Every structure is written in structure tokens, then in C-alpha cells.
């Protein structure tokens, strides 16, 4: 399904914002010794709007739903054969670079996280070393009813008690790895513990155990009276659905970006001479898939570009789309910019181009060196190639999944 865009409504405020983003990226980019500081001075969106086609509509990908405030500074890790290899593995075959957040999720899923210790028990039954307390009467009462109760008066205060915080899955997580079990003895061995499924809370297990003795008033009381009203409150209806759109974008743009820099001559001394340079990006070709995920409950929009060769991304489970013949013809007209020093194709299978070159196969740049009122050199190849590489690298590092941008929308 094709989507029409009102391209004329892109105003100067958005253009100024993009100029600031590009300047921050250019200030951190490494430059050759003969290139001075690079700055974007103006941006115009042009009149040619992109061709946008809706190719998929699905649930939000799991990585978009996670809070990554604490993981913003983490770097990817290398995973080999299902094992973490953050310090460099022994076998480099068959590895992939994945976000640290996703690797940590797989690590905890396999039991290597908190409370693991090689135990195959469910998370809510893994326990630390046993301890005794004068208040074993609670535990004895629990054994008589065919259940296990936590030991210690501090179970009511929350310090070292049964529950500690609300987990991400919606069920209470156990403090210190799990409940504290009383020591077995010949007279009071461990009873059969009715283990609740992972989808149920331990409180539900206590309630089911209390059905053995309807006259027991102690077990019929809620373990956490303060939390009981919150559980009974109905959830507020969410009028905004969660959905994820996949858009195929084909854009032959006539936008214009003006960039200024300088050419440095470091002989016979560093920065002996400086020649002003003016570069104008007069157009580019973009062909890629854009993912837009909308969280209705939190009013957030996540945007990223997908790599069609990534089998583990948000669209990795979807069959590959057939390439439009018109797109092939357009790509043939504007082939990717290649290095003049690169060797010709020798007939062997070639590695795929970097994602930046596949997304932006062509970037058209005009260059001028010197002052406008004096002699000017035009079309300096090395400078133009450097600017092309910076643009492709910026798109790859800022927008290609697993990198994505999140927009927080207002309540209005």
C-alpha cells in the first residue's frame, strides 16, 4: 500500500534541528590531516518526495519495549554458540555482534543470571543459605498446611522478606534470590511444595493452599494488605494501540546541503596554508526499509532503519521481498560510489557492501576550493569522498537497528 506525503510542510525549524545533529556528528568524526573542521551551514529538503510503501504491520519488537536508560552507554558483545564472549572468544567462526541488552536477556533466560548458581529450580524457589529464627511458629504452621512460609519477623517489613520489587514480567520478584526455607528434621521433613507456574504469583499459591482448611482465618488473610487494593483496581483502558509499521522507502532526492571546511597544507610546517572549501550535497539516492513502532500506553514512537541482511532484526522472520524491476533499473543508473583504487571484480564471490553504501548508493556533491572572487578549484575527489563516507557512517551509527531514536509525545 502506497503512502502519500505532504513534503511541502517540512519547515525550516526541522531543517535547523537536522543541521545541529549533523554538526555534532561531524565534530566527533575523525578527519585526515589535510581537512579542517567541517560544518553544515544550510539544508533544504527539496521538492522530490520519497516513494513510501507499507510492507508490514505487526506487534512491537521486544527491544523497543525495554527501558534502556541504564544501558545507553553499553556496547555490543560478541555471542558465539549461545555463549557470551565479551572479552574475545576462542572461536571467531559463526559469531555475531548483538546489543548487550539482548545478550543479557538470553543469558538470564538460560539460568545464568541472579539466583542461577547452577540450580534448575524455578526462580521463586531458589534460596540462599538457611537461617533459623525464634519465630519458627510461622514456618511450623505452614508445614501443617502442606506449604512453606518465610522465616523472620522482617517478612512484614520487606527487609529480607518474600517480595522485594515488581519484576518486568508483572509478578513479584523474590528478594535475595527466593524465600527462606526452614531446616528439615526427622520429625518435620520438607512437605510437598505446591509450586505455582511462572505465570502466577506466589500469593495465588498461598490462597490455593488455604482451600485445604476453610476454617483457617490466618491463611485467608492477604499476605500484603497494603497491596491488595491495588490488585483489585481495574486497569485503565488504553485507547492507543501498540503497533509497528514497516515502510519501504525509495527516494531520489534533490535536497541541498551546504558544507564548509578547509584544505590544510602542512608543508613546510603544520597548517602552513589553509584553503577554504565549500561543498554542496545536491542530491542522494536512498533505498531501505524503515521501522516505526508506536507505544500507545507510554506515548512513544521508535524509529530505525532495518538492514535487509540482518536475520535477527525486527523483520528477520519475514520472507524476503521481491525486488522491484524499476528499482533495479534506478540502481543501475546511479551505481554506488566506488573507490578508484579498488581492484576489479575477479569473479570470486564478493562480500556484501556496507549497510551505509546499500542504503545510500549515490550521493552527489559539488565542491569549490578557494575564494569566490579569486581562482577556484572545483570537484575535488578526495574531499568529496570523505564527506560521502561521513554521511553514510552517520546514518549507520544513528539509525540502523539496533540503533534507534525514540520520540516522546505529549499527552494532548
UniProtKB/Swiss-Prot annotation:
GO molecular-function terms, A-Z: lipid binding
Region of interest (Disordered), residue spans: 66-96, 108-136, 166-238, 314-354
A GO-annotated cellular component: ERMES complex
Annotated localization: Mitochondrion outer membrane; Endoplasmic reticulum membrane
Skewed-composition ranges (Low complexity): 220-238
The keyword Coiled coil is annotated on this UniProt entry: no
Membrane topology reported for the UniProt record: Peripheral membrane protein
Region forming the signal peptide: none
Iron as UniProt keyword: no
Keyword terms: Endoplasmic reticulum, Lipid transport, Lipid-binding, Membrane, Mitochondrion, Mitochondrion outer membrane, Transport
GO-annotated biological processes: mitochondrial genome maintenance; mitochondrion-endoplasmic reticulum membrane tethering; phospholipid transport; protein insertion into mitochondrial outer membrane
Residues covered by the SMP-LTD domain: 1-410
InterPro entries xref list: Mdm12, MMM1_dom, SMP_LBD
SS bond list: none
Subunit and partners: Component of the ER-mitochondria encounter structure (ERMES) or MDM complex, composed of MMM1, MDM10, MDM12 and MDM34. A MMM1 homodimer associates with one molecule of MDM12 on each side in a pairwise head-to-tail manner, and the SMP-LTD domains of MMM1 and MDM12 generate a continuous hydrophobic tunnel for phospholipid trafficking.
Xref: PANTHER family: MITOCHONDRIAL DISTRIBUTION AND MORPHOLOGY PROTEIN 12 (PTHR28204:SF1)
Recorded family membership: Belongs to the MDM12 family.
Domain notes: The SMP-LTD domain is a barrel-like domain that can bind various types of glycerophospholipids in its interior and mediate their transfer between two adjacent bilayers.
Record function comment: Component of the ERMES/MDM complex, which serves as a molecular tether to connect the endoplasmic reticulum (ER) and mitochondria. Components of this complex are involved in the control of mitochondrial shape and protein biogenesis, and function in nonvesicular lipid trafficking between the ER and mitochondria. MDM12 is required for the interaction of the ER-resident membrane protein MMM1 and the outer mitochondrial membrane-resident beta-barrel protein MDM10.
Protein name: Mitochondrial distribution and morphology protein 12
Taxonomic lineage: Eukaryota, Fungi, Dikarya, Basidiomycota, Agaricomycotina
Amino acid at each position: 500500500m502506497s503512502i502519500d506525503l505532504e513534503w511541502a510542510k517540512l519547515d525550516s525549524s526541522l531543517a535547523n534541528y537536522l543541521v545541529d545533529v549533523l554538526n555534532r556528528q561531524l565534530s566527533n568524526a575523525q578527519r585526515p590531516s589535510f581537512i579542517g573542521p567541517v560544518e553544515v551551514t544550510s539544508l533544504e529538503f527539496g521538492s522530490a518526495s520519497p516513494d513510501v510503501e507499507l510492507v508490514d504491520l505487526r506487534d512491537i519488537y521486544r527491544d523497543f519495549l525495554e527501558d534502556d536508560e541504564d544501558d545507553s552507554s553499553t556496547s555490543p558483545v560478541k555471542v558465539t554458540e549461545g555463549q557470551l564472549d565479551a572479552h574475545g572468544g576462542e572461536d571467531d567462526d559463526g559469531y555475531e555482534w548483538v546489543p548487550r541488552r539482548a545478550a543479557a536477556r538470553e543469558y538470564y533466560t538460560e539460568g545464568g543470571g541472579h539466583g542461577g548458581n547452577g540450580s534448575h529450580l524455578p526462580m521463586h524457589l531458589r534460596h540462599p543459605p538457611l537461617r533459623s529464627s525464634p519465630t519458627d511458629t510461622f514456618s511450623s504452621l505452614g508445614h501443617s498446611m502442606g506449604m512453606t512460609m518465610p522465616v523472620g519477623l522482617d517478612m512484614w517489613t520487606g527487609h529480607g522478606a518474600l517480595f522485594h520489587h515488581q519484576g518486568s514480567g508483572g509478578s513479584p520478584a523474590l528478594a535475595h534470590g527466593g524465600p527462606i526455607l526452614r531446616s528439615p528434621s526427622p520429625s518435620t521433613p520438607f512437605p510437598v511444595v505446591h509450586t505455582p507456574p511462572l505465570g502466577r504469583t506466589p500469593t495465588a499459591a498461598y490462597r490455593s493452599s488455604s482451600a485445604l482448611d476453610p476454617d483457617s482465618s490466618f491463611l485467608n488473610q492477604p499476605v500484603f494488605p497494603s497491596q491488595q487494593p491495588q490488585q483489585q483496581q481495574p486497569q485503565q483502558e488504553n485507547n492507543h494501540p501498540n503497533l509497528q509499521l514497516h515502510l519501504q522507502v525509495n527516494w531520489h532526492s534533490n535536497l541541498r546541503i551546504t558544507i564548509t571546511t578547509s584544505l590544510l597544507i602542512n608543508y613546510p610546517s603544520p597548517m602552513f596554508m589553509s584553503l577554504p572549501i565549500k561543498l554542496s550535497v545536491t542530491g542522494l539516492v536512498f533505498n531501505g526499509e524503515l521501522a516505526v513502532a508506536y507505544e500507545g500506553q507510554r506515548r512513544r514512537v521508535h524509529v530505525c532503519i532495518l538492514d535487509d541482511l540482518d536475520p535477527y532484526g525486527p523483520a528477520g522472520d519475514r520472507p524476503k521481498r521481491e525486488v522491484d524491476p524499476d528499482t533495479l533499473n534506478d540502481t543501475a543508473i546511479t551505481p554506488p560510489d566506488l573507490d578508484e583504487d579498488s581492484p576489479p571484480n575477479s569473479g570470486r564471490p564478493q562480500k556484501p557492501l556496507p549497510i551505509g553504501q546499500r542504503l545510500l548508493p549515490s550521493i552527489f556533491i559539488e565542491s569549490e576550493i578557494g575564494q569566490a572572487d579569486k581562482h577556484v578549484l572545483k570537484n575535488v575527489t578526495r574531499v568529496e569522498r570523505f564527506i560521502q563516507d561521513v554521511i553514510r557512517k552517520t546514518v549507520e551509527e544513528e539509525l540502523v537497528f539496533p540503533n534507534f531514536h525514540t520520540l516522546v509525545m505529549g499527552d494532548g
